[in-house]
């Protein structure tokens, strides 16, 4: 992947967001071949052997190094995630073009991924976490805004993007209720480079979601959304 021009070479400015339980190697490959950035979380592979197999499948299909189509892997860098060190070792073995960090300081990942020429994006929910990621040397910030699925944010993209652009000149990605061309154009008008789109891909044939869940997603509306702090979240 050409780090300097990969965004311009995309068919649409979208990262297919990594979703727990849902995203897999098949979805990554299909997304990247369709002209966007496919990604998946390492935690979806319950064993290191399964993660190694997924990496092997993806690199065989999408290529390696500068000849690779754009794709990424998401790793939890929280100290509570016991497997992060082993996951990083496999990342260094297969060298995905983009590594997305979540729920912790990305510094150790940045240093190692930059050694092989990869890009590191960090997902953030506020300016405090944005500054920590910037100080760690990330190449891009994923602004997880109000309306994002999973570990959601509270800020409106109208406020978040403009404030981040004052302190960061790298790649800006925005997530949160983006599911159409109109919403992609809206975040581009704000100054974002890429859309972080997840829910739209749950109902694809490649995803690991059950058929019943896919049907529920297709038929759901805003009234079904529940926001809770009772399961997991982001420390301050």
What does each model-found stretch correspond to?
Residues 1-171:
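Active-site entrance/lid segments in N-terminal catalytic domains of soluble metabolic enzymes
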Residues 20, 175-180:
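Gly/Ser-rich catalytic serine loop of serine hydrolases
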Residues 154-170, 179-236:
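Conserved active-site-proximal phosphate/metal-binding subdomains
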